[in-house]
Amino acid sequence: MGAEIKHKFVLVTDRYPAQLKTNCMTHQVCLAHLIRECVNLNEKTGSAWVLKLKKIFKEIVKRSKPESIKIKARDNIVKRLDQILNQALTKSHEKVKTLRVKLLKIKDYITTCLYYPDVPAENNFCERSIRNVKLKLKVSTNLRSMQGAESYAIIRS
């Protein structure tokens, strides 16, 4: 046999290595997570490069709706992203350089949502759908005491 079967779906991922190894048609990296990472990194470093990156990520999210992107505009966004990622960062903070290296490895997965109209730019909808279950799992052992129950009530409100 030898050949792997590609499944006909696009996985929206948080960049975990196991997720990126999933056998699927392609991946879309969650841009909400990348934007959040850019915000945090900019607060720590004040990097202008990170601000450019955040701006283009936001544009990709905005343009990821099927009716709002034309081929020429999409190609322009992809070209600008490549230019940003390929900039030399000789005087940048080490964490900024690390982010750049990580993004270069997955750059094809950043703009998938511009090519496939049904693919969302972020996976927050999945995370929201499991939030209540996960929250209950985290605090369920505390419900045996009055203090635990009160803490749970505060968290849920």
Describe these PLM feature segments.
Residues 1-157:
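Catalytic center-proximal scaffold of phosphoryl-transfer enzymes
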